[in-house]
Amino acid sequence: MNESKSTLKGKVKRYAKVSSKLTTVSAKIASNKLVGKGDNNKNAELVLNALGGLKGPLMKVAQLLSTVPDLLPKEYSEKLQQLQADAPSMGSFFVKRRMKSELGLNWQKKFKNFDIKAKKAASLGQVHKAKVNNISLASKLQYPDMMSTVDADLKQLKIIFSLYGTWDKTIKTKDIYTELSQRLKEELDYKRELKNMLLYGNILKNEKFINIPKPIKKLSTNRLLTMTWLEGTSLMSWKESNQEIRNHIAKTLFNAWYIPFYKYGIIHGDPHPGNYQVTNEFKKLPSLNLLDFGCIRIFPSSFVGGVIDLYKAIRDNNEELAIKAYKAWGFKNLTKEIINILHIWAT
C-alpha cells in the first residue's frame, strides 16, 4: 500500500473512531438525563474515557479546557485535569512495534533497561523510563499514525470553527485555525523538539531553580525523543505549601516563561500543568522541571516590544501607547469598542 492510500485509510479510521466515541458519549449522557440520572460525576467520567482514548488534538483541547477557571462544571474540570499527566497509554505490543520502527530490530540492546509500561501518556505520545550506562532516561514515543490523526482532527475543528464564525464574526477563526494547525504539525517533529530543548537549556542555563532535560541524539528520531530523566512531583501537589514556597514556585514559573520571551522572543506554547514538575533537590527552596518543548513559538522583536508597551499602557492608563501596542500586533481599524474589548483580554 502506498503512502497516500495509507494516510487516507488512517484518516477514515480516525473519522469513524471520533464519531463513534463522541456519539456514544452524547447518547449516554442524554439517556441519563432523560431517566433522571444526570450525575455530573458519571458523565464527566464518560467524557474523560472518550477523549483520553482518542489522543491527538481533540485531547489537547480537553487539556486546555480543564485549565480555564469556571469554564466547565467542577466535576468535568476535575476529571479532564487527569489528561494533563495521566492519560491512557499504548499497550506493550504497540510499544515494541513502534520502538522497532524507530531504532531497528535490536532496539532493546541499545538500553540497559527499558520499561515497556509508560510512566506518562499524553495527547501525541507517551514517556517510558529507561537506563543507559546507569543514567536514567526518558524516551518519548509518538503514537502510531499521528499525522493522519492530526489531519483528521484539524478538518473536524475547521468545521467547528466555521460554524462558530457564522455565530460570532468578531473573532477570525481562520487565523486561529492556521496557527493551531502549524503548531500541532510542528509538535510531531521530535527532531525539532530536540533542538528546542537545547535552545531552552542554553537560554535558562543560569537559572539555578529551572531544570531542562538533556537530549540523547543517538537514541532519538523524528518520532522518538530520548532525554535525561528528571524526577519531580506535579505542580498542583504543591498548592498547600506555605506562602514562601508558593511564591517561589510562582516566581520560577514566571522566569521560565518570560525570560525566553522578553530576551529572545520565544514562548512555550503549551503551558498546561502536566508539562511542569516541582522537585525539592534544594533543601530550602524547590526547583522547576520543564518537560515538553514541542510547541515553541518565536516572535519578531516588534511583537515583544508591543507586549512591553501594552504593559506600560495598562499600568499608566495610556490609551495612545496601548493603540501603538495593538497595532504592533497587527490589529487594524481600531475603534473605542474594540480597544475596550482588547483591554479586557489583556488584563
Task: Indicate where each model-derived feature is located.
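N-terminal accessory/targeting segments that precede structured cores
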Residues: 1-126, 130, 149-173
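Helix-rich C-lobe and terminal helical cap/extension of kinase-like folds
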Residues: 4-8, 12, 35-42, 221, ...
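Alpha-helical scaffold elements adjacent to nucleotide-binding pockets in ATP/GTP-utilizing enzyme cores
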Residues: 79, 98, 153-159, 196, ...
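Catalytic-loop Lys-Pro-X-Asn motif of eukaryotic-like protein kinases
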Residues: 273-278
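A generic structural motif
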Residues: 143-145, 294-295
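ATP-dependent phospho-/nucleotidyl transfer catalytic cores
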Residues: 74, 81-88, 100, 147-152, ...
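Glycine-rich ATP phosphate-binding loop
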Residues: 129, 136-143
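Conserved beta3 strand of the Hanks-type protein kinase catalytic N-lobe
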Residues: 130-131, 271
